[in-house]
Amino acid sequence: MMVLTWEASDKNLLSNAVSLYYASRPEGPWEVIVHGYKNTGVYRWDLPTGLAGPVYLRLEAADKAGNVGRYELPTPVALETGKQRVKVIGVGPAK
């Protein structure tokens, strides 16, 4: 399991605004971790069986107008046994 944490704020976020993704390369392809999740700031990810090597992580947060803010970690996260904690440091406004 890996614990993912983040902060996403917008006065018009959807109730299930957050989607999390992972990829083995920075350009993807991106696989869904969870889609349409509540903006609780924490998700406990049960890693898929056979997932190996470091992964890149992406967070998307959507508002009621359909705008989507996206943040991708610039460096991959190592997958190791034991406790893992990842903190996403921000999502900016959609452009």
Question: Each predicted region: which residue ranges?
Answer:
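Low-complexity, Ser/Thr/Pro-rich intrinsically disordered linker/stalk segments at domain junctions
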Residues: M1-K95
